Design a protein with these regions (language model features):
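Structural signal for conserved beta-strand scaffold positions within catalytic alpha/beta enzyme cores
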Residues: 24, 108-111, 229-231, 338
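Basic- and hydrophobic-enriched, low-structure N-terminal and domain-boundary segments
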Residues: 1-42, 394, 417
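Walker A/P-loop NTP-binding active-site region of P-loop NTPases
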Residues: 47-121
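Conserved P-loop NTPase motor cores
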Residues: 29-47, 51-59, 68-77, 113, ...
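P-loop NTPase motor core of the ASCE superfamily
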Residues: 124-173, 177, 322-418
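P-loop NTPase motor domains
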Residues: 2-22, 72-74, 81-86, 114-306, ...
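Short, conserved catalytic or adaptor-binding loops enriched in Gly and charged residues
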Residues: 95-104, 219-222, 327-331
Length: 418
């Protein structure tokens, strides 16, 4: 039997099973011992899951891991302020982006709702590889035109041919240039695609995927280092599969963002420990393209030294099984943290985690106190424990997610940055 590889774990709480004992966790400990690389944090709003997710990200920042958080609502962005509260300070980079520098290293908030983010995630600009550009374009189009009636196989082939031609002749290709070409195509069915994309380019979040004509700028974030938190405040969050145009655009943007973050992390040397955190993960997993992306990180992450942390309100939202509910990559799970939820969802978690049914785990989960950080933790061996996650009160004060508090923090950071 191989020796256990020891890692620099962090105290995250205490076990409530019998005698209280300390509980340690590290996002890379499982894969360091040939286990899975995926940790999940699930529970209803106010249950403590976001608090626990932030605590793990802070611990990884202290350990100088490269951490990239995707957080549509912006809850995780408070880590940048915590870095200041811990003794750091606000700074601005050459582009005027505000970040904090302190005990957690550099913590940067990439606000995709800001006016400066127009064209920041143009799928034709994120990689110089033709295969990547076409993969991104196909995935984005399939999410936006998901009914299959508008984007038929023949129409897709024509669109891709126009895209290939643009990539051949344009030194700075963009989705904007492609959209103009499609809008004037002789085929009416192709023009419909172009006109729809043109309308999307005028929306608050759609414009993030369309680089302005004449722009030669690279993405604002061109490499992963320190802690980066991408936010999309105000984005439409579908409860399940996106049902309207606004939700489809939001999910398409999130897919492009997640693809790009994976691209940046996989480019880093394997010796660098990397943590990818996706909050509201159901927005990614509810589409086939996003699910495939998550599966790829779960499969390939161990060889690239990437730990994947998924947070969502329901465990069933982020199951790693295939479309039929079986197979998939369930063995990629390293740890599961289940906070308070309703009894039906709790029963689903008990089954998915392989816990014995009929022993009251579902009732216990449903009765956990809200906001206290109480959860059931299942480790890579399938061993469960009810724990109270410990977060210092000073951190909790900063982690508050009240919208007015968040706006006040952003204003204060802007005034203090040098």
């Amino acid at each position: 039997m191989a020796d256990t590889v020891l890692v620099d774990s962090t105290l995250i709480g205490v076990s409530l099973d019998g005698t209280q004992t300390p509980v340690f966790y590290d996002s890379h400990s499982s894969q360091a011992n040939n286990g899975g690389n995926v940790t999940t944090f699930t529970g209803t709003q106010g249950s403590g899951k976001t608090m626990a997710t932030e605590g793990v990200m802070v611990a990884d920042g202290y350990k100088r891991k490269t951490v990239f958080g995707i957080c549509p609502k912006g809850d995780l962005a408070s880590i940048a302020e915590l870095n200041v509260q811990l003794g750091g300070h606000w700074v601005k980079d050459d582009a005027g982006t505000i970040m904090s520098r302190g005990p957690l290293g550099v913590v940067r908030v990439w606000d995709l709702s800001a006016s400066e983010s127009v064209g920041a995630l143009d799928p034709m600009r994120l990689s110089g590889r033709r295969e990547d550009q076409m993969e991104l374009l196909v995935g984005m189009l399939q999410i936006i035109f998901d009914d299959g009636a508008t984007l038929t196989r023949n129409v897709m082939a024509t669109v891709l041919a126009y895209a290939q031609d643009m990539l051949d002749r344009e030194p700075y290709p963009s989705l904007t240039i492609l959209t103009r070409t499609l809008s004037h195509a002789p085929d009416e069915s192709v023009r419909v695609i172009g006109k729809t994309l043109s309308a999307i380019s005028q929306t608050s979040f759609g414009r993030v995927m369309f680089a302005p004509l004449g722009s030669t700028a690279k993405p604002a974030v061109s490499e992963a280092s320190g802690t980066i938190i991408a936010t999309m405040r105000g984005v439409a969050l579908p409860a399940s599969k996106p049902k309207n145009d606004e939700e489809r655009v939001s999910v398409a943007l999130l897919y492009v963002l997640a693809w790009y973050v994976r691209y940046l992390m996989f480019r880093l040397p394997v010796e660098v420990k990397k943590t990818l955190v996706i909050d509201e993960a159901h927005m990614v997993t509810k589409t086939e393209q996003g699910r495939d992306l998550i599966h790829n990180v779960a499969r390939m992450g161990r060889s690239r030294n990437v730990a994947l942390l998924l947070a969502s309100q329901r465990a069933s939202d982020i199951s790693l099984s295939d479309n039929n509910g079986e197979g998939g990559i369930e063995n990629a799970f390293a740890y599961r943290f289940q906070f308070r939820t309703d009894k039906k969802e709790a029963a689903k978690f008990v089954k998915d985690a392989g816990l014995p049914e009929g022993e009251g785990y579902d009732s216990a989960i449903a009765s956990f106190p809200g906001g206290k950080g109480r959860c059931i933790m299942v480790d890579r061996f399938g061993k469960p424990a009810i724990i109270d996650v410990f977060i210092p009160q000073e951190w909790l004060d900063v982690f508050g997610t009240n919208p007015e508090e968040i706006r006040a923090r952003r204003k204060r950071a802007a005034s203090q940055a040098k």
